[in-house]
Amino acid sequence: VIYMAQLKMFWINDKKVELLPLPEGYSFSTYKDEADKAAWVECCKNGLVGDDTKPEFFDDCIAGDEHCNPCTDCFFLDYNGEHIGTITAINQGGIGDMHMVGMKTEFRGKGLGKYLNNMCIYKLANEGVSHIYLTTDEWRKGAVKSYLTSGFLPVQYEMGMEERWEKVLEEYGIDSVDMLYEDCTLYKKIYRSSLAKRVKIGVVGARRGQTMLNYCKTGFNCDVVAICDNAPDFLAGAKEKYGEDGITYYDNFDEFIKHDMDGVVLANFANEHTPLAIKAMKAGKHVLSEVLPCQHMKEAVELVEAVEETGMIYAYAENYCYMPAPREMRIQYREGKLGKFEYGEGEYVHNCEPGWHGYSNCDPEHWRNTMSAFYYCTHSLGPLVHITGLRPVKVSGFEIPFNDRMYRMGAKAGAMAVEMVTLENGAVLKSIHGVGPSRNSVWYSVYGSKGRLESAREDDSDKEGVGTLFGNLDSYEGENNDNPKEMDTSDSLSKLAEDSGHGGSDFYTMYHFIQAIKGNRNAEIVDVYEAMDMFLPGHFGYLSAMNNNKSYDIPDLRDKAQRDIWRNDTTCTVKEKAGDMYIPSYSKGNPEIPDEVYEALKKKRENS
């Protein structure tokens, strides 16, 4: 099932309304008695109701609304005494509802819809409503055009709406129209597709950046204009795949950042994002950073302050937040259906041995071989933080020992890590992640005062793992009604995202970043503060593991006073970044891995 939200439109009551004079032979009447129910159904066929709809449906749809009085609110447009069209104008406590606008087939295409709209607007405006809303669909072309002509404006209330309306305007030959938010404030003026400004994007990292490049090349709201990579082979491969029409290629970031573009995607090495992000923002570019946001606390402080000082958009591409199950978990929690948040678990464990020779380039000093087990924590922890919006305040870390698999991979760290995190409301999270387990698992589970939500396990071959969500929720606290069921995880972007990487989640990170650049305050990005809330539990979790699992407070980098404490702290596992604050990547001291291991990995790479 592909979910597609209806279009929503508002008419703002800020102008005087007069009734339009009707053509000869036409008049208005209101609902009078039972006989009008059948006429109402006939007017609503061909789109609003099925051909077999009974007159009794009027009671459910119109008369059953507690705010509706059919005798004053349900209008008929009559031709020579026959009901040929209908509209219902309901005052929903100061907000107008234009409801069930229908016209008999033989009277369509005559421009009569404007008279129905006008009657509804006139009635509700004179009752003093703040605005009138309606919902409709693109395929009701005549109706949509008549609403626009009557002064209704599109509403940006769900992702994908702007692009859908651009297509509508293009089809109708309308150059532009104002678009509103749901609170009736102006979002911005939007333009037909052929006139809409496309966001210009540059991508750093031609390998991991391919998903972002593909989005830009096939997407509907941006173009890739520059690609940067210091690896000649990767840059040449990108040039062959994406061509040179409209794209400039760079092997130097400082030259790349001078290019005329709106935003930059950082898909380079995970421990090298911060310096490039800061340079980009200071050059006036918005930034989408792949995981991870920074290497140590000094970089964390510098990154936060660069965002604050420049005012540029920083979005953290924690794509697992947008996997179907955690994405829907967030919606359910934010709508209050889970109740008060109490506990959550996140797993991102990945047996990387089969591909490690490619991931790490067989290099003993590659960042993947020198990271602690705690470093790559945001795939497991990030979705839980994003679901709740709650800040982590304490963490205790536990390290799973270095094992034979990690030895064979040449990775100098524990096989996995566990963070036990306390949130600001007292709830607890368990996050487990790592590259050295024997099997894979991506899984999330959250508990609230009204029940539980969790994704399917990967080993359940009948389900789609993190693409499947199970819910067992009470309608109120204390109901204790055990009612497990599989839940729908589709939304208005699911169809567009289905061919994108990581279960479609890569589409969402790019889409929301582009929407943020375009000024949409509803864009669901992970900002720099939330990125730190996802990263810091891993950083301090490792310090905990090195100190007998001692609990560590997690700083709030929104607070400058707390930033000052960590401003010069370079504690990390990369020698050239840490200086005299260097710590080993394994809590018991870095394991000795002979050169022969890396030579064997090189042979494996050559033969693959």
What are these regions (language model features)?
Residues R207, I313-A315, Y320-A411:
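Predominantly a Rossmann-like dinucleotide-binding segment in NAD(P)-dependent oxidoreductases
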